[in-house]
């Protein structure tokens, strides 16, 4: 991990110190391996910071008409709130007008999941995702809608489990109505 390369305390030791600070007995059998598991889980949740974006494969359009929008609704993804490092459960809907070829469906989904795998502020993430999709999909236009359930306000602070945040971004001339539903685990 990056922290180890910088010669800083091993991440597991930092987690162990935090657990002790919170009053946990870190020698307890159920907790003794928690620092290692926590660091591994956090690594998975932030893999987008270290891994390159997935390659996008394109297929020829094979027709002469102007392509209409392609819509992919309710892509499930998980991110972290950059302020509290608590999970954000996301449902992302994307529409794009293909440029020179159509990207593979699974590649679009993988790209969204990769983009979400990092600490984010949802408002900024939505704008960045629209730019990223325009570039990587070689699209003529893109629309994005992100519905997020933020654990930082679900389990702490206002403790409201019924809300969700919806953010939208659009690039180019695209006329679609996206329907992004609350993430599946939060319905």
From Swiss-Prot:
Coiled coil: none
Domain of life where this protein originates: Archaea
Reactions accelerated catalytically: GTP + H2O = 7,8-dihydroneopterin 3'-triphosphate + formate + H(+)
InterPro entries reported in the protein's UniProt record: GTP-CH-I_C/QueF, GTP-CH-I_N, GTP_CycHdrlase_I, GTP_CycHdrlase_I_dom
One of the record's GO cellular component terms: cytoplasm
PROSITE patterns: GTP_CYCLOHYDROL_1_1 (PS00859)
Keywords in alphabetical order: GTP-binding, Hydrolase, Metal-binding, Nucleotide-binding, One-carbon metabolism, Zinc
Gene3D superfamilies xrefs: 1.10.286.10, 3.30.1130.10
An individual GO BP term: one-carbon metabolic process
Keyword flag Secreted: no
Entry-linked Pfam families: GTP_cyclohydroI
SUPFAM superfamilies recorded: Tetrahydrobiopterin biosynthesis enzymes-like
Complexes and interactors: Homomer.
Family stated for the protein in its record: Belongs to the GTP cyclohydrolase I family.
Name used for this protein in its record: GTP cyclohydrolase 1
Species in which this protein is naturally found: Pyrobaculum neutrophilum (strain DSM 2338 / JCM 9278 / NBRC 100436 / V24Sta)
């Amino acid at each position: 991990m990056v922290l180890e390369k910088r010669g800083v305390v091993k991440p597991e030791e930092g987690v162990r110190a935090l657990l002790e600070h919170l009053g946990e007995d870190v020698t307890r059998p159920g907790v003794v391996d928690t620092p290692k598991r926590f660091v591994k889980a956090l690594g998975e949740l932030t893999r987008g910071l270290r891994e390159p974006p997935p390659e996008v494969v394109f297929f020829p359009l094979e027709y002469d008409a102007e392509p209409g929008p392609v819509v992919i609704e309710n892509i499930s993804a998980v991110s972290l709130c950059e302020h509290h490092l608590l999970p954000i459960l996301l449902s992302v809907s994307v529409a794009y007008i293909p440029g020179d070829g159509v990207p593979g469906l699974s590649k679009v989904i993988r790209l969204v999941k990769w983009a979400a795998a990092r600490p984010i502020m949802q408002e900024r993430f939505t704008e960045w995702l629209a730019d990223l999709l325009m570039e990587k999909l070689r699209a003529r236009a893109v629309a994005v809608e992100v519905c997020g359930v933020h654990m930082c306000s679900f389990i702490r602070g206002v403790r409201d489990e019924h809300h969700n945040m919806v953010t939208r971004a659009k690039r180019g001339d695209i006329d679609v109505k996206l329907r992004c539903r609350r993430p599946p685990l939060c319905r």
